């Protein structure tokens, strides 16, 4: 942007300040983190970095770290790519453990007892407008070097497909065993727990896939943080649990932990750690 401005108005160079200051905020806790988190201040020159730091210093209580704008932009991409890689490791473990007959939640809990191990929790993929998007900027710009980053994206995208196949197999098995189609509760559409943000949500992608590929199945779609959706009728989480033969946990919203951990008349598929037994 600076290059475009100064190409058209070269006399403005040195008279206006431009800086890139990536946000580090958690959905659902934005204001607190906007104020308290450390910030990276990337100016196109020292004067720009100083001016931006002075502005952010008026309301940010965290430390301000000045650098150049290119490093600041890469810092944002690297932060989210790092999270994506770590989540991919957890998601890959969950698929390995399913084949090996090992409880992945117990395994991760035990492995994390090691003082230098901190494995994240697996889910049904990665969503949101940052972690699921930013790695592509690095892998597309540096395709020969960004091997791990690109592979992590593939793993996290595949995890959603894996969940779809697991759910479809459970539905087909129920039909063969009971000679009828099941009611299926799809629990959660948001990309992470306890928010209403559906952007790039793997849970949403899974729900849409199942809804489209199994039109004769009754799906009870649950998202306690929204009141309506243009594509689905939203069902209360308790009603969906009670009425469904198969319960599929896609997002670990706090309300779901109030439901029974076991039910003799239901098959429960837990892709996000609501039930960790």
What is each residue range found by the language model?
Residues 1-277:
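Structural/interface elements that position substrates and couple domains in central-metabolism enzymes
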